Every structure is written in C-alpha cells, then in structure tokens.
Amino acid sequence: YNAKREKSGITVCRGEIIPKGLYHLSVSVWIVNQQGQYLLSQRHPKKQYPLYWECTGGSVLSGETSFQGAIREVKEELGILLTPGSEKLIYQSRRENVQDFYDVWLFHKDIKIEEMRLQETEVVDVQWVNPDKLFEMFRLKHLHPLITYVDQLIG
C-alpha cells in the first residue's frame, strides 16, 4: 500500500524489507464476551516481546481484506471461528515505525477457554479479563507495547 492506503501492486514477502514509502496491512482482534470480559493471549517466550499479553493479530496476506485477515488470524492462533455480523472496526492508524496500516477489530463471542486450540508456536496461554484488569495490565506494561489505544477500547 502507498501512504494513501491504495494498493501499490507490489508484494513483499515475510522477512523482506518493505520499500520506503510503502506499507503492509496488520490487524488486531479483540474478542469480548457477554460478561464484558476481553480475551487476551500470552505470546510465546521465543517471540519478540516474550510472554507479553495481547489480543490476537498479525499481518494480512496478499489478496485478503483486513476483515478476512482478522478472521484467519483468530482461527490460526486460537482455533476460534468468528462469524460475520458481530464485528466492528474500532481503530485505524498508519504506523510509520513499523510501516503498516493497522486495523483493530472488535468481535462479540462467548467461548470457553478449554474449547480453544492454541497455536503452540505463537500462544502459550489465554485468559478473559474485565475492563479494570485490562487497564491495570496496560498501566503496568504487561500488554504488548504496540497496544497504545486501550483507553479507546474500553472507553
């Protein structure tokens, strides 16, 4: 994508340097249950920002929309199938430091932790947290450092 979020026609493979002036598309997905709790996953210890808590997310693949990438990432990392209809795009930004357009989605879904199938190379644990605990984890810097919008999420 160019700086106006228009497709550039250039495909950059994972691990390659993104040319200056171009951006890739990334998504984060927050899942909230009927009790108003947010689902957090804990990063694998061998990943960057080891053992930090975060919502699910990743890079959108070539040919996918932001929404499709969000659905795929949650299925891959947590084994949860999200269905269209409960989603809301809650935040968008262009982040120069990581050369991406960043979309944040919110889905409503009730699922028990024991029903999830964690991707072992990505996620080591999951938990449901209430908004107060989420904000406290943010304040204590227990969340992935790129998550900077928690106040907007929980309003």
Regions inferred by a protein language model and the residue ranges of each:
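A glycine-rich, hydrophobic loop/mini-helix early in the fold
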Residues: 26-57
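A short, polar/proline- and glycine-enriched secondary-structure boundary/capping micro-motif
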Residues: 19-21, 49-54, 127
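Short loop segments at secondary-structure junctions
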Residues: 4, 33-36, 44, 108-113, ...
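Charged phosphate-binding loop/patch that engages nucleotide di/tri-phosphates or the phosphate backbone
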Residues: 142-155
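Unchanged
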Residues: 60-145
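Acidic, metal-coordinating catalytic segment for phosphate/diphosphate chemistry
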Residues: 1-28, 34
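Short helix/strand-bridging catalytic loops that position acidic/His residues to coordinate divalent metals
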Residues: 15, 57-58
